[in-house]
Amino acid sequence: GLAAEDALLRAVLRPGDHVLMGNDVYGGTHRLVRRIFGPWQIALTTVELGDLDIAREALERLRPRVLWLETPSNPLMKITDVTALAEIAHAVGALVVVDNTFATPYLQQPLVLGADVVVHSTTKYLGGHSDVLGGAVITNDAELAEQVQFQQFAAGAVSGPM
């Protein structure tokens, strides 16, 4: 899942960009942005996205390139209003990314709710036993999909035999 997230973020972020994410996202995602992208001048701010007033204030003040959310979140299982956040985020020009790993596409379709990109850790819900590694990036934006595919091709972050 993290390789999929990494390919997406490399496709959209540039030095000086800002990522706003929930304060309870998966630790690996937080670590990826803070410790891998941080040295390349990518700023990260975390807030309680379940409180729309706090989220709105942060989005309007920071004007991030990416709003990253999980619903339900991992590990606290907090629920976030994807539609409301997407509306606010799009008003300030942010790309809305939803980690939909816990909900799965069966229970929630974030693209229908207004998200721009959906990511899944297929390690968790397809493998389930950490014996298969994988991730998915889904978007309706053909240009963005092409940029992510290039990152995956160029960096080799795709599933394949060893």
Regions found by a protein language model. Give the residues of each.
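Conserved PLP-enzyme active-site core in the AAT-like
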Residues: 1-162
